[in-house]
Amino acid sequence: MKRRLASKKTVVCVGPGGVGKTTTAAALGVIAARSGLRTLVCTIDPAPRLADALGVANLGAKPSPIAAATAAALGIASPDRLHAMRVDPSAAFAQLVNEQVADPELRRHIFGNPLYRSVTTNLTGSQEYAATLALYEIRRDGAYDLIVLDTPPTANALEFLETPERLATAIASPAVQWFARPDPREKRFSLKRLGVGGAMVIRRAGRLMGSQFLDDLGAFLLDIREVLGGFLARAREIEAVLKQPDVGFVLVLTPAAAAVSEALYFARRLRETGSPLCCFIANRTLPEPGNHTAASLRASLLSLPSLCDLPKEELDLATTCLARMAEFLAKIARAQKQELERLSREAPGIEITTVPLLPHDVSNIDSLRAIADRLGSG
């Protein structure tokens, strides 16, 4: 993993929610910082997972170094080698608007429009696009040797990859370009531009949502055309960045059938788009099942001081319960092994790194150090 990180400027951790993606991103940041790279780990997840993992009290939209005590506990020579931040989607969109619109009055109109706020916070893909905007700006700034991006929690790992392309396609569509076409005679948006059918739809929406909706819509459609060209250009630039050889995608998963199938599909999509897949990281893997007999399990129980004086009936019951639990875990371990073999077989040449299931939740520095040690040894 150290070798792979050394050859990259950006590592993007992708995968569905709940697979340990944020912790993996933090661990990769620790590995890079240990090797002397000035590293930034950034997330767009509003939950405090990254802050908790790195021991950062207030994770904000500006990069900040980890605490000196945290750096020492993680085996990092200097706290300045590892910074962390949380991407603010509103700030990411606002920065792009500020770049594209010179007129402060027009910027004020755009930022104050409720539809702008709704589109940039609630529209499907807005979080993913904000993450790509932040990544683009940080790379352009050049302050870090490595950027590790923890992508938004999503049910579909493809959201991050496809959002810039979808946005560019939408902006370039004839319908949006028609709305964006300048007309110097227009001081406000006119429903006449929509034709009879379109105007009827908008009027009905206005009756349902109120006249203010029509005013907000008209202002938004007129104002936003000033920035559509910039949004389109930036989306195209981000598409190009994600295909650079110094960018590596790390697909984080758990060794379950559905997760592996999604990972294989994502790997195929990456190949189709020319984006580089660095490796798979499979979290929460169980060890190879041992050959546990009833006698060996009973002996293990008797070796515990608190259980050695149990009555025979209770010891028999405990042995039976332990045997069933061992059988259950062995079944899961065998299923995981089969899924990882399928992943290796259907995605040849892509390295798979496994991280064992820890006996406790990953919520402190000791757990993060253990995962970084595991990943760094591969």
List each language-model region with its residue ranges:
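C-terminal lobe/tail of nucleotide-utilizing enzymes
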Residues: 1-5, 195, 203-222, 232-378
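Nucleotide-state-sensitive switch-loop elements of NTP-binding domains
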Residues: 1-12, 19, 24, 28-232, ...
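Glycine- and acidic
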Residues: 12-14, 116-121, 247-252, 325
